Structures are given as structure tokens and as C-alpha cells.
Regions:
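Hydrophobic alpha-helical transmembrane segments of multi-pass integral membrane proteins
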Residues: 1-425
């Protein structure tokens, strides 16, 4: 606990609003899924799905990651966060930009609001990247986790700039590559460059710490780093130049890199001293099981089997949903229970440690509700994926409804933690 809430940690007022905004956005997204299941049965380039996707990746996942990273950077790099002012400004701009961007996509309007929103997001990301880079620069701790985090932020900046370029190209076409291929480039830069590498950088530090694992082989992370980045660059260039063989080759480089990271996590799991996994770690473990699905789908889509031609559009949506709604969302919810309670606990009880009997951080939320939330999420996600793959809106609606219940329970626990009042007065 002291490792997560280190002396270098920023004010909780910087971190906690990110969790609150992110949780409410996830709840809003599940509502949109319930009332717009048809968005998942069309080609992925449709207004509703674009709006939902950007709410997911910016307002929910990236927002939570920003907040968590402000808390964790001082732990990983052993220095104070460079600027809390940058963090607050970035939060405000990202929140406003995400809402306006989602509204513009929903209206499929590429006018003034869209470009104001995109500018807000780009500036927010720019402030975040500057904060991370300046923090990293002041650190003398040169570890592979630091390299992953710094690299992921560069990819995030590339991703949002690519998104802005896409919006400009939609209104004033100047690129020969089709918008669909450019959208794939934008999406994979974000998924593999930003999310996957950030997850590797943070989890390779935190998960062994949470499981109390020692002497795990970090060379596996170095292999993962070079394989993922070489493969990603090759893949993006191939997408832009529309060289299909290059795209397939890039996947054949990236996937073994991810498996090298998963091997590191499995080794940490087998060497763990703490045998009993709590609910946060159980949901984290479930998220890694979900990864099997996008691995299977990506090669199914790349090799373009003739008998699956009619299924290509729904399988493409299923692939993205498995990564964003399945793997990353599950991981974020699981790690919320491993980070936020410690942050709030220290804020509330900092001056009383050792003086009175205090509740544990895990006492700040309801474990029964967290377990119910995990089961509902698992059932809802499976139904959602079946509904997408089979293009059956009734199953999509049912899956979305169950995900809504899961998101509601997650938010109940989230705000129970955030508004926790001190006990043993």
C-alpha cells in the first residue's frame, strides 16, 4: 500500500476526478449500447459506433489511465509528478473534448464543433505527454517499465494527431489512402501503441507487486518491447501503403511480442507468494483470458477465408469490441479495486495511522457487489459478442442490458470508495 501511495504522490484532488468521470462515462456507454444495439450490426464506420467508441477509449479508458498514471508514475519512476497544473488542465480539456467529439460523431458532423473538440483532445494529450516526459526525464531509474510508458505516450500523441488528420481528410480530402484504411491505422496505433504498451509498462510493475512475486525474468519484457514496436511500425506503414502482406507480417511479429509479455505475467503468477487472489485480481485475470478472442479474430480477418466473407463486417466489430469492451475495460475495472481504495484510504486516514484501529483499503467497497459486477460483466460481454458476431439485435440488447447492470454496480462501489468518510473518530 505504501508503494502505491508514495511520498511523491500528487494530491488526491488531481487523481480522483479522473476515476469519477471515467466511471460515469462507462455507465453512459452501456446505456447507449442498450438503446442503440443496431450500431454494432453495421459496418464499423457508422456515426453511433464511432461516438460510442470514442466515449469508451477517451472518456472511460484513457481518462482512468491518466488518473491512475499520475498516481503510479511516482511509484515506477521514484520522483514527483512534474506538474499537477498540467494534470488538472488536461483533465478538463479531455473531458470537454470527449463529450463534444462524441456529439459530433453522433451527428456525423465534421464542422466547427468537431474541430474544437479535436483541438481540446490534442492539447489535453499534449499536456499529459509533456507531464510524463518531464517526469521521466527527472528520474534516474532506467527500467523497461519506464520505457514502455514513455513510448506509449508518444504513440498516444501520434494516435490523436492521426485522428485529427482523419477528420480534416474527411472534409478536405488530400490523402490517397481510403478513409477505412486510415481508420484502421488510427485504431491500431491507439490499441497497440497506446493501450497495450501502457498496460504492459504499468502491469509489469504492479501485478508482481500485488501478487508478491520475486525474481521474474524482465528480459521477456524487452523482447515484447522490440517485437511490438517493430511490428506496429511495419503494420502502420503497410496499412498506409495498402500492402496486405506487410500487415500480416506485422501481426506475426506483434503477437509473439504480446505472448512474451503474457509469459512474464504467468511467471509472476506461478512465483507469487500471495496465493489467494482478491476480486480486483480475479477480474484482472479474467481480462487476460479474454485476449484469446481478439488473437483468434485478427488472424481470421487477415487471412480473409472465402467462406467467412459475409461475416467480415461483424467479425471486425467483434474484434474491436473484444479488445476495448472485453480486455481493456475488464482490466480497468479490476485495477480500480487495486488502486483507488489505497488512494482514498491514505487521503482519509493519513494523520491517524498507528493511532487507532483503522479499516483496511478493501473495506472501502463491497466485495459482494464487486463479485456480482464481475459475473454480470462476464455474462453481458459474452452475449454482446455473440450478438455482434451473429448480427442479432435482441441478443445485443440483452448483453447491453446486463453490461449496464454491471456498470451500475461498478459505479456504486466507485463512488462508495470516493465518498468514504473516516471511521473510529
Amino acid at each position: 500500500m505504501n508503494q502505491i501511495a508514495s511520498q511523491n504522490a500528487p494530491s488526491p484532488k488531481v487523481v480522483i476526478p479522473h476515476y469519477a468521470f471515467g466511471g460515469l462515462t462507462w455507465l453512459a456507454v452501456t446505456l447507449l449500447i442498450v438503446f442503440n444495439p443496431d450500431a454494432f450490426t453495421q459496418h464499423f464506420f457508422n456515426p453511433e459506433l464511432l461516438a460510442i467508441t470514442h466515449l469508451l477509449v477517451l472518456g472511460w479508458i484513457t481518462m482512468i489511465i491518466f488518473g491512475a498514471l499520475y498516481q503510479l508514475l511516482p511509484v515506477i519512476m521514484e520522483v514527483k509528478l512534474y506538474s499537477e497544473s498540467f494534470a488538472i488542465a488536461s483533465f478538463i480539456l479531455l473531458g470537454l473534448g470527449t463529450i463534444l467529439l462524441a456529439f459530433s460523431f453522433w451527428q456525423f458532423s465534421f464542422g466547427t464543433i468537431m474541430f474544437v473538440a479535436a483541438t481540446f483532445v490534442v492539447v489535453a494529450v499534449g499536456l499529459f505527454v509533456a507531464n510524463v516526459l518531464f517526469t521521466a526525464h527527472s528520474s534516474t531509474k532506467k527500467v523497461i517499465e519506464r520505457t514502455f510508458i514513455v513510448t506509449s505516450t508518444i504513440w498516444l500523441l501520434f494516435t490523436v494527431l492521426a485522428g485529427l488528420t482523419l477528420a480534416v481528410n474527411q472534409v478536405h480530402p488530400f490523402l490517397k489512402t481510403s478513409q477505412i484504411e486510415l481508420l484502421k491505422l488510427h485504431a491500431h496505433a491507439g490499441i497497440v501503441g497506446w493501450f497495450i504498451q501502457l498496460i504492459i509498462g504499468v502491469s509489469s510493475k504492479l501485478l508482481p507487486m500485488f501478487m508478491v512475486s520475486h525474481h521474474v525474468n524482465t528480459k521477456k519484457l524487452t523482447v515484447a518491447y522490440y517485437a511490438i514496436n517493430i511490428g506496429l511500425i511495419a503494420g502502420l506503414v503497410s496499412l498506409f501503403l495498402q500492402v496486405k502482406f506487410g500487415v500480416i507480417l506485422s501481426a506475426l511479429i506483434i503477437v509473439p511480442g504480446i505472448f512474451s509479455y503474457l509469459s512474464f505475467i504467468y511467471e509472476a503468477y506461478t512465483k507469487r507468494v500471495k496465493k489467494q487472489l482478491d476480486i480486483g485480481m480475479k477480474q484482472t485475470a479474467f481480462s487476460f483470458l479474454i485476449l484469446v478472442i481478439p488473437f483468434f479474430l485478427i488472424f481470421t480477418l487477415l487471412f480473409n477465408f472465402k467462406f467467412l466473407n459475409n461475416l467480415t463486417p461483424p467479425l471486425s466489430v467483434a474484434y474491436g469490441s473484444a479488445i476495448v469492451i472485453g480486455f481493456i475495460t475488464s482490466l480497468v475495472m479490476g485495477q480500480t479495486y487495486k488502486t483507488l481504495p489505497f488512494i482514498v484510504w491514505l487521503k482519509v486516514y493519513r494523520g491517524r495511522i498507528g493511532k487507532v484501529v483503522l479499516p483496511l483499503p478493501k473495506d472501502l467497497y463491497s466485495e459482494k457487489i464487486a463479485i456480482a459486477q464481475l459475473w454480470l460483466f462476464a455474462i453481458g460481454f459474452v452475449l454482446l459478442l455473440i450478438g455482434i458476431s451473429a448480427s442479432i439485435t435482441r441478443i445485443l440488447f440483452l448483453g447491453g442490458t446486463i453490461l449496464l447492470l454491471s456498470a451500475a454496480l461498478y459505479n456504486f462501489n466507485l463512488f462508495k470508495i470516493i465518498f468514504h468518510k473516516p471511521k473510529n473518530k
